[in-house]
From Swiss-Prot:
PANTHER family: PX DOMAIN-CONTAINING PROTEIN 1
InterPro entries: PX_dom (IPR001683), PX_dom_sf (IPR036871), PXDC1 (IPR040288)
Domain PX as annotated: residue spans: 1-134
Entry-linked SUPFAM superfamilies: PX domain (SSF64268)
Single GO MF descriptor: phosphatidylinositol binding
Protein name (Swiss-Prot/TrEMBL): PX domain-containing protein 1
């Protein structure tokens, strides 16, 4: 199972002010062509900087587990927090729009927790840019502006492993990314609930790939990407 897991953080003395879930990207995560869904998350930090992140359902489960492990004396208090319920709501969502909204609610819950937790190394590390985010980011984007465009299917773009000329964005998949390929991450039995199981993506695997990329366009401010093959 691929993920955006990494250790350590360079975001000391900073915290997340807000986050929005823009959509879902389905990426190839192994040489066998296995695909996994990643939520595309826009985060705004205390210094007004903006990061675009990609996290899987398994990453969300690990975040909640690591919070409990990092504060063993507060396990009972963290158990009362609506984190587990949020994960179950995401896993049980029957459509993509509901799933995106539930992911956003869970992340808002995390960053709204007392500073002891929301500004802990565990949370800051989760929201730090990962090697996967480095590959998918667009360095030419400097500002956010409203963008109302139709959903874009990108599964075929990912399979092409190269440049996209569909006038939406340029994507390059680098198979040398650490923690990718066929490497499996260690997880104990309690974490299996949060793994991205087959039933989690069954509605996307049936039929003709209804939407490999779906965005929440009702009120989000998205980044319009421009494609330039010469970049």
């Amino acid at each position: 199972m691929a993920s955006a897991v990494f250790e350590g953080t360079s975001l000391v003395n900073m915290f997340v002010r807000g986050c929005w879930v823009n959509g879902i990207r389905r990426l190839i995560v192994s040489r066998r062509g296995d695909e996994e869904e990643f939520f595309e998350i826009r985060t705004e930090w205390s210094d007004r900087s903006v990061l675009y992140l990609h996290r899987s359902f398994a990453d969300l489960g690990r975040l909640c587990k690591r919070l409990r492990d990092a504060f063993p004396e507060d396990r009972s208090e963290l158990a009362r927090a609506p984190l587990r319920q949020g994960l179950l709501a995401i896993k049980g969502a029957h459509d993509i729009e509901t799933r995106l909204n539930e992911v956003e609610k869970l992340l808002e819950t995390v960053i709204s927790m007392p500073c002891k937790y929301s500004r802990s190394e565990v949370v800051l590390t989760f929201f730090e840019r990962s090697p996967l985010d480095q590959v998918l980011k667009n360095d030419n984007v400097h500002k956010i502006q409203p963008s109302f465009q139709s959903p874009v299917k990108i599964s075929e773009i990912m399979r092409s492993n190269g440049f996209c000329l569909a006038n939406t964005e340029t994507i390059v998949i680098d198979h040398s990314i650490p923690n990718g390929k066929d490497q499996l991450l260690d997880a104990d039995s309690t974490e299996h609930l949060f793994e991205n199981g087959g039933e989690f993506t069954s509605e996307l695997e049936d039929g003709d790939d209804p939407a490999a990329y779906v965005t929440n366009l009702s009120y989000y401010h998205l980044v319009p990407f421009e494609t330039d093959i010469l970049d």
